[in-house]
C-alpha cells in the first residue's frame, strides 16, 4: 500500500479511487489533484512512480485533509455550541441541525427510541 497524507491507499485500485480513501478528498478533488500532477486517472496505484507519488503528496500538503480537517470541523461545532446559536443547541441535544422534521424520523441522529410508559386505565 502506498502511504499518502498519512493514509494507506489501496494498491490495486485506480489512483482516482484510491485517493478518496483520504478524509476530505472526494472524486472531484481527486481528479483535480491528478490533473495538476499530470497523472492519468486510469493508472493503478501500484504503477505510480516515486516521482508521481511525490507530486501528489506535494499537492495534497496544500489541501486541508485528515486530522487538520477533522480538527477544524470539531472546532467549528464547538464554537457554535459556545456562542449559544440555534445550530449549537441542536448539536448539543443531538438533534438534526439543518431544519429536518423530527416528529417521525431522525432516528439516525436521535438514536434508538426510548419507550415511554403509557397511561394506565
Swiss-Prot record:
<comment type="subunit">
    <text>Part of the 30S ribosomal subunit. Forms a loose heterodimer with protein S19. Forms two bridges to the 50S subunit in the 70S ribosome.</text>
</comment>
<dbReference type="InterPro" id="IPR001892">
    <property type="entry name" value="Ribosomal_uS13"/>
</dbReference>
<keyword id="KW-0820">tRNA-binding</keyword>
<comment type="function">
    <text>Located at the top of the head of the 30S subunit, it contacts several helices of the 16S rRNA. In the 70S ribosome it contacts the 23S rRNA (bridge B1a) and protein L5 of the 50S subunit (bridge B1b), connecting the 2 subunits; these bridges are implicated in subunit movement. Contacts the tRNAs in the A and P-sites.</text>
</comment>
<dbReference type="GO" id="GO:0015935">
    <property type="term" value="C:small ribosomal subunit"/>
</dbReference>
<dbReference type="InterPro" id="IPR019980">
    <property type="entry name" value="Ribosomal_uS13_bac-type"/>
</dbReference>
<protein>
    <recommendedName>
        <fullName>Small ribosomal subunit protein uS13</fullName>
    </recommendedName>
</protein>
<dbReference type="InterPro" id="IPR010979">
    <property type="entry name" value="Ribosomal_uS13-like_H2TH"/>
</dbReference>
<dbReference type="GO" id="GO:0005829">
    <property type="term" value="C:cytosol"/>
</dbReference>
<keyword id="KW-0689">Ribosomal protein</keyword>
<keyword id="KW-0699">rRNA-binding</keyword>
<dbReference type="GO" id="GO:0006412">
    <property type="term" value="P:translation"/>
</dbReference>
<comment type="similarity">
    <text>Belongs to the universal ribosomal protein uS13 family.</text>
</comment>
<feature type="region of interest" description="Disordered">
    <location>
        <begin position="91"/>
        <end position="121"/>
    </location>
</feature>
<dbReference type="GO" id="GO:0019843">
    <property type="term" value="F:rRNA binding"/>
</dbReference>
<keyword id="KW-0694">RNA-binding</keyword>
<dbReference type="InterPro" id="IPR027437">
    <property type="entry name" value="Rbsml_uS13_C"/>
</dbReference>
<dbReference type="GO" id="GO:0000049">
    <property type="term" value="F:tRNA binding"/>
</dbReference>
<dbReference type="InterPro" id="IPR018269">
    <property type="entry name" value="Ribosomal_uS13_CS"/>
</dbReference>
<feature type="compositionally biased region" description="Basic residues">
    <location>
        <begin position="106"/>
        <end position="121"/>
    </location>
</feature>
<keyword id="KW-0687">Ribonucleoprotein</keyword>
<dbReference type="Pfam" id="PF00416">
    <property type="entry name" value="Ribosomal_S13"/>
</dbReference>
<dbReference type="GO" id="GO:0003735">
    <property type="term" value="F:structural constituent of ribosome"/>
</dbReference>
Amino acid at each position: 500500500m502506498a502511504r499518502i497524507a498519512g493514509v494507506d491507499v489501496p494498491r490495486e485500485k485506480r489512483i482516482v479511487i484510491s485517493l478518496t480513501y483520504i478524509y476530505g478528498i472526494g472524486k472531484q478533488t481527486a481528479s483535480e489533484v491528478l490533473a495538476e500532477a499530470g497523472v492519468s486517472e486510469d493508472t493503478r496505484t501500484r504503477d505510480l512512480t516515486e516521482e508521481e507519488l511525490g507530486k501528489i503528496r506535494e499537492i495534497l500538503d496544500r489541501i486541508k485533509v485528515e486530522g487538520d480537517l477533522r480538527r477544524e470541523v470539531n472546532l467549528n461545532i464547538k464554537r457554535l455550541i459556545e456562542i449559544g446559536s440555534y445550530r449549537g443547541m441542536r448539536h448539543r441535544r443531538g438533534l438534526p441541525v439543518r431544519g429536518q422534521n423530527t416528529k417521525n424520523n431522525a432516528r439516525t441522529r436521535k438514536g434508538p427510541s426510548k419507550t415511554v410508559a403509557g397511561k394506565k386505565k
